[in-house]
Amino acid sequence: MSPRSKTLSKQMKAKSRSAIISAALELFAKKGFSATTADEIAKKAKVSKGLIFSHFLTKENILLAILDDEIDRFLPKFDQNDEARDPKEKLVSFINGWLRLLEKEPLLVLLSLRLNLDESWRKILRKKGKQYVEIYLKRMRALLVQAGSKKPDLDCYLIGVLFDGVAANYVAAPKLFPLNDIKNYLVELLFSYWQN
């Protein structure tokens, strides 16, 4: 096989893998993992069922690939070079990053919510995302201490629960949910809570 043929073959393989991942993400998010068939994924991705299984041995492997490809987008990143900024600015930046993820990747957020409702997948999701959650908790805790939180560990979980609630309501009715108003109110609410 010529170098050009190898390059084209790699590109085609990457393109078909990407199509499978995109189709599966949408179907798993909208229908649920168990309710989605490999035939539906093949049809949506416009590939053969055999091609799906040449990339992934099982439907579970497709989901694991989605998690591997997308896990770092579940948690917005903190800017590590923002030591000079005050805690409120950092929190606003974090909330904005998380809300951008929610707006740009609602299917990914919906899939995460669905998986968290399924005990077996919740364990897998937690295991896969463990390092990211630990980074999130460490950085969020430090930010909360800076911001004046008296119970930063509990506040980390409280913020997580608030984010889950916002995410669930937004993906259920994105056109009706006042996301920008919630963002502004959430920052003010958290800071007034810590100041008391």
Predicted regions and their residues:
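N-terminal intrinsically disordered/low-complexity leader segments
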Residues: 1-15
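Helix-turn-helix
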Residues: 19, 23, 27-61, 65
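Hydrophobic alpha-helical connector segments
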Residues: 65, 79-104, 146, 156-159
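Short, basic, alpha-helical segments at the C-terminal edge of helix-turn-helix-like DNA-binding modules
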Residues: 68-74
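Amphipathic alpha-helical packing segments from all-alpha helical-bundle domains
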Residues: 75, 104, 121-147, 154-157, ...
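Short alpha-helical scaffolding segments that buttress acidic/His motifs in well-ordered protein cores
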Residues: 98, 112-116, 159, 163
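Amphipathic alpha-helical segments used for helix-helix packing
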Residues: 102-123
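Hydrophobic alpha-helical segments that form the core
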Residues: 151-172, 181-191
